Every structure is written in C-alpha cells, then in structure tokens.
Curated annotation (Swiss-Prot):
The organism of origin for this protein: Bartonella quintana (strain Toulouse)
Pfam (any one): Ribosomal_L23
InterPro entries for this protein: Nucleotide-bd_a/b_plait_sf, Ribosomal_uL23-like, Ribosomal_uL23/eL15/eS24_sf
Protein's name according to its UniProt entry: Large ribosomal subunit protein uL23
Gene from which the chain derives: rplW
Subunit structure: Part of the 50S ribosomal subunit. Contacts protein L29, and trigger factor when it is bound to the ribosome.
Matching PANTHER family: 60S RIBOSOMAL PROTEIN L23A (PTHR11620)
Keywords: Ribonucleoprotein, Ribosomal protein, RNA-binding, rRNA-binding
Kinase found in the keyword field: no
Amino acid sequence: MKDLRHYDIIISPVITEKATMISEYNQVAFNVAPKATKPEIKAAVEALFSVKVKAVNTIIRKGKVKRFKGIVGRQSDVKKAIVTLASGQSIDVSTGL
C-alpha cells in the first residue's frame, strides 16, 4: 500500500554515470531524506515501485563550505541510498522525469 510518508522518504533518483554503471549489478541509487532509516527506505521502495529489495546501503555526503560575494555559506548534507534489488527485479528511473 502506498503511504504518503513513502513520498517523503524517497526524494529523487540519482542519475549519474556511476549510478547507471551499478544498474548492471541490479542496484539503483536514490537521494533520500536525511533522517530516513534503512528499513524505512526499503519499505518505501517496495511500496512505490512494486519490487522486492534485497539490501540497502546508505551514504551521507557532507555539505561543502562555499563563498558567495565574500559571504561564507554551507551546502546541506545529502543522504544517498544504494538499493540492491532481488534477482529478476528492475526499476526504470529514466521514465517519468
């Protein structure tokens, strides 16, 4: 069942060269909410895409310090999830963009 909380957990798919390379290993990358846990990410992907998830790995990329016109600012931290799907399952993230 699709719950509105699932849409808050999965922010967007990651579409980079490296993310397309891991699709050979039946994996998909998503930007997720910073406070999302692995079980929440697994439940959200299974509910939204109707697939079976084998494993979830998460990465937190720390935000960089940037300067703009002499003012120092900081980019936000980003949490990324690498979702491994069960064999025979697939998600096409290029559709619906």
